Amino acid sequence: TDIGGGLDVGGGLRGGLDIDAKGPDVDIKGPKVGGDISGPDLDVSGPDLDIDGGGKKGKGGFGFGLKMPKFGFGGHGKGDIDVDADVDIERPDLDVSGDADLPSGGVGLDVGGGIGGGLGGGLDIDANGPDVDIKGPKVGGDISGPDLDVSGPDLDIDVDGKKKGKGGFGFGMKMPKFGFGGHGKGDIDVDADVDIERPDLDVSGDADLPSGGVGLDVGGGIGGGLGGGLDIDANGPDVDIKGPKVGGDISGPDLDVSGPDLDIDVDGKKKGKGGFGFGLKIPKFMDPTFGFGGHGKGDIDVDADGGVVIPEGDIKVKTGKPDIGGDVDLPSGGVDLDVGGGIGGGLGGGLDIDAKGPDVDIKGPRVGGDISGPDLDVSGPDLDIDGDGKKKGKGGFGFGLKMPKFGFGGHGKGDIDVDADVDIERPDLNVSG
């Protein structure tokens, strides 16, 4: 009798002749890679301003001018926070082979490589391939950009102007261009390169059973398993392979940059035709070194008028490729069964043959992690302004507040770019049994 068919994922062989040939149990676990790769905690806050100005009376005027200096951390220099972690773990090239040879007898079974196969008939043959449990590495980690807290200055301004006459009261405050801008280049670069490959492993086991009523030849692979009335049990070795555990914490520095606290109390008294004038001008608040603008290179990348760029996290994880194949050969006898490879198909007939492929548990590596941009807290200045103008006459009271260009905008390039490149390849696995 000649039976040929496609291979089924599953299936089994059953019959009155009981032959049980089991390949090796193979349990392969890749390394666990855990880590915390985080950029710096960045806290940048502008100055706290508390200004109290009072001006009184007469034809004259009161003038107050406050001009903040260029308050910066920089220059044209180059500064960067660079966290570079290179982890290289090599996986095994795994070669597991087990031979179970039963010489010729009444039944001949030839199972080509595949993932199973299902045939039914009156003769009960149970062929089980090896149990293969392959687990890739667990890669867990927390890759996060910096915690960025950027806040403008706290402003508390109390202005009281009382006046008689033709003059007027005027208040003007002009905030600066307070932004993270400029033409410079800045970045926080967290580059984590994880390359995981398994070690070379060669496990072989031979089980030879002399001639009898059934001929069984089990080549390597993920296929095969025979059972019948004649009890033959050939077990390959149990193989348990665990890769190394790699854990780490890679974190950038905590960076806290804060401007000065400014408390200004101004009282101006004057007589004359003029009026009362108050002017607050804060300069351009830049920091090229730390990325707050300017033309320099500053490598905490808050780029181009407030562009906030998360560190480009580049994470690469590589593992090897499995190569699993096998042949189960039973020499010729009363029945000749040839099952070709494939992932489908099942044949049924009066002859009960149940061919089971191996229990194959292949788990790729678990790549877990938290890849998140920074906790970004950007707040404009807190403004507490109390202006009281009382007046008699033709004059007027004027109050002007002009907020700056405060934002993450402009023509520059600002993005949150988290680039995680995970390249996972299975180990070179050669299992034959």
Swiss-Prot record:
Region annotated Disordered, chain positions: 366-389, 411-433
Chain positions of motif Nuclear localization signal: 266-274
Primary localization: membrane
InterPro entries: Myelin_sheath_structural
Domain of life: Eukaryota
Tissue expression: Egg cortex.
Keywords attached to this entry: Developmental protein, Endoplasmic reticulum, Membrane, Microsome, Nucleus, Repeat, RNA-binding
Location of the region described as 3 X 11 AA repeats of G-G-G-I-G-G-G-L-G-G-G in the Swiss-Prot/TrEMBL record: 112-350
Protein known as: Vesicle-associated protein
Organism classification: Eukaryota, Metazoa, Echinodermata, Eleutherozoa, Echinozoa
